[in-house]
Amino acid sequence: MRNAREGTRQRSVHIGLPAALLALVAAMVVAGCGGSDDSATGSSGGNVDIVAYSTPETVYTDSLEPAFEATSDGGGVGFSGSFGASGDQRRAVEAGQPASLVHFAQGGDMIALEEAGQVAPNWDQNKYKGIGQESVVVLAVRKGNPEGIKSFDDLLTKDVEVITPNPLSSGGARWNVMALYGSQLHEGKSEKEALDAVKTVLEKTIVQPGSARDALAAFTQGEGDVLLAYENEAIKAEEEGEDVEYVVPPSTIRIETPIAVTKDAADSAQSFLDFIWSDEGQQIWSDNGYRPVNQALLDEQKFPVPQDLFDIAEFGGWEKVTDEFFDEESGKVAAIEKELGVPTE
């Protein structure tokens, strides 16, 4: 496991809320909490304010929270939650949205909160390197795989319509891009050829929703032939009887989602985080289609290990990757999106 900082048709596009609007919403939330003894991070007493990326919402509300409440540490603890595109969620916390536990899709968002002084610098210094759970990027297709999709290369050579979230708002989309890019490098292609492959797939992308959860919704509603997705999202869709199955590409990236308590968070938030890393908490993630960070609990029948599984550290970690690929002004992927007419702000 790697440290997050190592190395961290008609086109329809939906991206996150503008920064100014996020700040206004966050300010309204804080104002609505006036008169309490809450700290600057919004944590108080026995309440845990969760701000997280979109896909694990039901794992928290339906499984993790009730299981924790049944423990001796969780008695009397209350929860509030906000879930959405990872980048939007991080910007909301920066703007003042109450948060005592933050869980993002990729390390760049957590590092930004660390640099803003809202998360302690040692957030990633435990045995799991601050990672809540893992997944891999997969290719979700229609039942029976009518297009015969087996790898990222098929997205380049076949006449297919693709769905992936917008990489300027969605952490999941950034994992998708780096999975595709890395798979090409591992075939021996140059960095330019790998970036050209990313451009080709984005050209075939018919919709770029703001989050991974919204991208899955578009796919299950019948749009597109292939969805670049978290493995857990594909598993969820299959289990719910959607017209979906998925392919684990032979070469793909390990997804690591960082989690931390904010500075000045109540003890209940740390207790909940400790529960998430416990065997019981990790088993809950596994039961919901995520790969546990506790390797002793990994079921390799349910979660096959790809032939060529690589990490974000291979590209310099999320700080470097964010600057090189996803910076709105100078990032290589942002430049491709601008060329394709996709909003980047």
Provide a role label for each language-model segment.
Residues 3-20:
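Bacterial N-terminal signal peptides that target proteins for export
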Residues 7, 35, 266-345:
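Extracellular/periplasmic juxtamembrane helices and adjacent flexible linkers that interface
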Residues 28-32:
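C-terminal motif of bacterial Sec signal peptides marking the signal peptidase cleavage site
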Residues 38-169, 308:
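N-terminal segment of the mature folded domain
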Residues 66-73, 156-213, 217:
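Ligand-binding cleft/hinge of the Venus flytrap
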Residues 137-145, 254-269, 275, 284-288:
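A bilobed periplasmic-binding-protein/Venus flytrap-type ligand-binding module shared by bacterial periplasmic
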Residues 144-151, 169, 182-190, 264-269:
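Short helix-loop capping/hinge motifs at secondary-structure junctions, enriched
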Residues 187-252, 258:
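Ligand-binding pocket segment of bilobal, Venus flytrap-like solute-binding proteins
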